[in-house]
A protein has these predicted regions:
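C-terminal regulatory/interaction module of P-loop NTP-utilizing enzymes
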Residues: 1-189
Length: 189
């Protein structure tokens, strides 16, 4: 048989590894997909032998490329279903409805105290990814100011994504202070 002529290796999919890879600028995965995978980790890989399409890190990255071009909202389901399967498409397009109701990111970056902090975990995952994507040297103090109002889990998520995306931002004084605070809490907890 043909399969005896090939090497077979089973790989395990890890959400943290995927997200660390996805936030890097050179991989350019859209924040909506990163947030979604964090919120629904079971959707990163869901192989069903009978399915034509199913989610994997590769198909999710391919979907990101398609969506990055800007597609009409009524086409998102069809693209997601064709690339990652029906179940993924249902969950993802539902998530997008939440994502699109996020607080105004530009307002957070300029006046973080004027924006209410959401309480829904789905929204917080989406918000952390969106903020990390927009963080730069000019707005980092405001990003951290807003981050301090988030729960610890989302503070850590935000700092991790920022530092993976741009290590230089990890040298910001506000970033360092919050990071030290989180490390102190973790070591005492």
């Amino acid at each position: 048989p043909l399969r005896s002529r090939m090497w077979h290796c089973e790989l395990k999919v890890d959400v943290d590894d995927f997200c660390a890879w996805a936030v890097k600028p050179e991989n350019d995965i859209i924040p909506e997909l990163i947030s979604f995978v964090r919120w629904k980790p079971d959707q990163l890989h869901d192989f069903e032998p009978d399915m034509t399409a199913y989610p994997t890190p590769r198909t999710i990255a391919m979907l990101s490329k398609l969506l990055k071009g800007g597609v009409p909202a009524d086409m998102e389901f069809a693209l997601a279903e064709g690339m990652c399967g029906r179940g993924f498409a249902i969950e993802y397009t539902g998530f997008l409805k939440v994502y699109r109701t996020l607080p105004n990111i530009k307002k957070i970056l300029t006046d973080p105290d004027s924006v209410d902090v959401p309480t829904d975990p789905c929204t917080l995952y989406a918000l952390a990814s969106a903020l990390a994507r927009q963080a730069d040297a000019g707005n980092m103090d405001n990003v951290i100011k807003f981050a301090k109002r988030l729960g610890r889990e989302f503070q850590l998520l935000l700092l991790t994504d920022i530092s993976v995306r741009d290590k230089k931002l990890g040298q910001n004084k506000s970033f360092i202070a919050l990071n030290c605070e989180l490390q102190t809490i973790a070591s005492n907890g």
